[in-house]
């Protein structure tokens, strides 16, 4: 396609006469009445993308005399500055030479320039409000093949400048598909200093309606206004899927390219079609990875979550979203963004698709036979190459020129680093490896070994992925069981709490009653514990006296109120010293007294221990059942069962054995 002529002509836009010429595919204007220049167009000629243009305009241009034009005819929009400020801006960014036809134009001579003659052409039907085409998509069962059909379009040698056709800012910033050198009908990128023909672009012939114009104003100057209010409550006549520029983009394409999450959600709420395509069959998700806005704002994860069902779409050149990502790596400053987009999509795919389906999409070839790995290797984007290889990307798939990713990787090893740096600005050159650091470039022998080892590495990765998925499923099942048990426990706690709340509500004195009952139980426990100690002491005294009576005249007496004591026996006061007439030696008597005292201390210690055992044992229904059984066997009431009877029963049972 022939490039546009740089000859200056006169045109009228929005009722304003301008001198116009086309430089690098950009319409550059100079107003006739005051010679003011469009600073936005100058920055486009200097190859600034939209975020960069916005920053330069805010920080350098709009601080001085300027006029901001919004609405009206698309090409006339932008920030206009006095002639000398425009010349200074062009000189600063080294485009004054290429812009000399418009900058050096003598106004007196310019008056003799005739308006550009419009070509007589049959009017095309209006495409405003049309829906974009649905994208070609790849299901998991059809990822083995590649759509190699090339677009069949006629190339027009000239472009008419019409008042009724919109050429909006930003349309030329699109990153095109990989050029097909063998195809004369391939669409060329604006980076090739050409523009798309009218027949291919299908420029809008009807003026934008109020909704579309409001949306375009927001997209072109988002820093200057809020989101259009009608999006929060879309009116019935608002067509959310209508085309709003001459590349066939809808509002959703623009919002996704900008990474504006709130705008995307509002458009989706208004029933925007996530699968709508522009004239190259590019979906909004594809457009979102062409620019770095989603990387700068770290919003791509949210965009991907909203548009994930279109990941498998391909455009008219058979390119998947992976192709579009790695295409941008021809610009070194976009490699980090491309790596970010790749990782996000690969992680999402591996979570929703079998591994083999992910591999098929990664190895998909476009209409030129290029895989995403081949393009990344050709551009020298080693970070992207490593990411793709980790998902079994095949470096041995040839394109139509019989070139493979392996060859580009080997060439990258052989190419000197200085040569790589000199090629850093190459666009789609097969020898462009910009951005590779010396540490990445390994010796040729190691590269050969690496390429040969790739199939083995891929197999190991597949086995590892299968084992990981198996273990992950087991852990997920364990987690489900644990969560179910946790939920049951929480439900039981909730029911218990509800019952407790109900009891407290129906019985206001419930808490006080419980405290009283607990206190009474503790007092009863203390009393029973003391009585048990007294009972044990009495039992031991009784047994001791009975065992000593046949052998000695020693008599042990204890106070008559002994059983009424609360603390049981003491060691020194409760017993009277025994009268022993058989002991004549006072020393022996004292020894016996000391021994007896020691035995009493030991006895009391053992008694306390026995009481503790009784307290821990308690009396349950089984013990009571035994008491009733023994009482019935002896023909007495359970209440009359005494220690003497129990001892007699025990002695009788022992003799029988």
UniProtKB/Swiss-Prot annotation:
Keywords: ANK repeat, Cell cycle, DNA-binding, Meiosis, Repeat. Residues 39-60 bind DNA. The keyword Chaperone does not apply. ANK repeats lie at residues 247-276, 368-397. PROSITE patterns: ANK_REP_REGION, ANK_REPEAT, HTH_APSES. Residues 114-134 have a biased composition (Basic residues). Residues 113-192 are annotated as: Disordered. GO terms for biological process: meiotic cell cycle; negative regulation of transcription by RNA polymerase II; positive regulation of transcription by RNA polymerase II; regulation of meiotic cell cycle; regulation of transcription by RNA polymerase II. Residues 8-115 form the HTH APSES-type domain. Signal peptide: none annotated. Induction: During conjugation and nitrogen starvation. It comes from the Eukaryota. This is Cell division cycle-related protein res2/pct1. It comes from Schizosaccharomyces pombe (strain 972 / ATCC 24843) (Fission yeast).
């Amino acid at each position: 396609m022939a490039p546009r002529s740089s000859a200056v002509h006169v045109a009228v836009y929005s009722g304003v006469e301008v001198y116009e010429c086309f430089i690098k595919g950009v319409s550059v204007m100079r107003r006739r009445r005051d010679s003011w220049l469009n600073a936005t167009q100058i920055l486009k000629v200097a190859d600034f993308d939209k975020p960069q243009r916005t920053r330069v305009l805010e920080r350098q241009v709009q601080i001085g005399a300027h006029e901001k034009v919004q609405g009206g005819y698309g090409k006339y929009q932008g920030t206009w500055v006095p002639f000398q400020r425009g010349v200074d801006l062009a000189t600063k960014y080294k485009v004054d030479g290429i812009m000399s036809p418009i900058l050096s134009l003598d106004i007196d001579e310019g008056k003799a320039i005739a308006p550009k003659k419009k070509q007589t052409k049959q009017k095309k039907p209006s495409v405003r409000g049309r829906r974009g085409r649905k994208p070609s998509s790849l299901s998991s069962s059809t990822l083995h093949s590649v759509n190699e059909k090339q677009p069949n379009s006629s190339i027009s040698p000239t472009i008419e400048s019409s008042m009724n056709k919109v050429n909006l800012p930003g349309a030329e910033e699109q990153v095109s598909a990989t050029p097909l050198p063998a195809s004369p009908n391939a669409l060329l990128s604006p980076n090739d200093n050409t523009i798309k023909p009218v027949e291919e672009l299908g420029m809008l012939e009807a003026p934008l309606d109020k909704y579309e114009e409001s949306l375009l104003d927001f997209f072109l100057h988002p820093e200057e206004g809020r989101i259009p209010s009608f999006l929060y409550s879309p009116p019935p006549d608002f067509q959310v899927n209508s085309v709003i520029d001459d590349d066939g983009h809808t509002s959703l394409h623009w919002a996704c390219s900008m990474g504006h999450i709130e705008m995307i959600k509002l458009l989706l709420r208004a029933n925007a079609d996530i699968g709508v395509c522009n004239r190259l069959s590019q979906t909004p998700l594809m457009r979102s990875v062409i620019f770095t806005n989603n990387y700068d704002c770290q919003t791509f994860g949210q965009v991907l979550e909203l548009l994930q069902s279109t990941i498998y779409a391909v455009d008219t050149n058979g390119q998947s979203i992976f192709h579009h990502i790695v295409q941008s790596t021809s610009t070194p400053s976009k490699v980090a963004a491309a790596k970010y987009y790749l990782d996000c999509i690969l992680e999402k795919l591996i979570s929703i698709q079998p591994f083999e389906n992910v591999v098929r999409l990664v190895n998909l070839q476009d209409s030129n036979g290029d895989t995403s790995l081949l393009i990344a290797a050709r551009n020298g984007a080693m970070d992207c190459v490593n990411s793709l290889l980790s998902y079994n990307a095949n470096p041995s798939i040839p394109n139509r020129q019989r070139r493979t990713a392996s060859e580009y990787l080997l060439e990258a090893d052989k190419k000197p680093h200085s040569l790589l740096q000199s090629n850093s600005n190459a666009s789609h050159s097969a020898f462009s490896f910009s951005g590779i650091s010396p540490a990445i470039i390994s010796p040729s022998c190691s590269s050969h070994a690496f390429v040969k080892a790739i199939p083995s590495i891929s197999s190991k990765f597949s086995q590892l992925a299968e084992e990981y998925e198996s273990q992950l499923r087991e852990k997920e099942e364990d987690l489900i069981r644990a969560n179910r048990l946790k939920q049951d426990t929480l439900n039981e706690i909730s029911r218990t709490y509800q019952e407790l709340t109900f009891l407290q509500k129906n019985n206001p004195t419930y808490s006080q009653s419980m405290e009283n009952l607990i206190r009474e139980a503790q007092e009863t426990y203390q009393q029973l514990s003391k009585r048990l100690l007294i009972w044990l002491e009495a039992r031991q005294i009784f047994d001791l006296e009975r065992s000593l009576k046949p052998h000695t005249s020693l008599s042990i007496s204890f106070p008559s109120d002994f059983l009424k004591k609360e603390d049981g026996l003491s060691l020194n006061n409760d017993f009277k010293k025994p009268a022993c007439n058989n002991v004549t030696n006072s020393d022996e008597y004292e020894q016996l007294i000391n021994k007896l005292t020691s035995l009493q201390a030991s006895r009391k210690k053992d008694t306390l221990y026995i009481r503790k055992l009784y307290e821990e044992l308690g009396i349950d229904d089984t013990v009571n059942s035994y008491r009733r059984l023994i009482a019935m066997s002896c023909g007495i009431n359970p209440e009359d069962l005494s220690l003497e009877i129990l001892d007699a029963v025990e002695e009788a049972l022992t003799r029988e054995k």
